[in-house]
Amino acid sequence: AASKYINVVPEIEMPGHALAALAAYPELSCDSTQTYKVSPTWGVFEQVFCPSETTFKFFEGVMDEVIELFPSEYIHIGGDECPKTAWKNSAFCQQLIRQLGLKDDTTPSKIDGIKHSKEDKLQSYFVTRMEKYLNSKGKNIIGWDEILEGGLAPNATVMSWRGVEGGMNAAKAGHNAIMTPNPYVYLDYYQEEPEIAPTTIGGYNTLKKTYSYNPVPDDADELAKKHIIGIQGNIWREYMQTSER
């Protein structure tokens, strides 16, 4: 990859999309007495990593191995699609929330204009813990735009997939952003009429629509323009069973 000037950025998903890991390491969950099984289908599941010292020690070890394998300045830590049900029902998590002094917002966030829960802020704590560790190793993190919820880690780059708002909010606040909004650059969406195309996850992005996307809006202020550092097209393989697809 390096010989072709390609920088491979690894992604280690946390704290959601954890089911496969919890099946192997149930002690990383909020309820280690529960039986976890790898799902045979894609989806968003309520079983997530617990923000415990055991979990952080596990991820620090994982990151040490990742750093040895990938010279990239950046490591993507996910952060998307993390239901908070397990944390709301966990005595450990609720005690940690009180210990950290986290509270539900009473006024909208200055970054995204939304009131966030104390569990959202616990995810920010999780992300910030991992950011500090990776920063100490000379690495910077990238996370999906959900990492904005509850407060953004100081040096994080936001990858905006749920539209353009997350990336723009991050850029306006002085954080780097990579624009990858699903209404434009999800390349696994239908590109022609669904009746005549192979089955995909959904959506409808024509080639014309994708090429028409401008990652830096004309009305963006100078600070935002400075911090929009790139664009990414995404392909997810739930419905791609062959290399030809």
Task: Identify the function of each model-found stretch.
Residues 1-137:
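Substrate-binding cleft of carbohydrate-active enzyme catalytic domains
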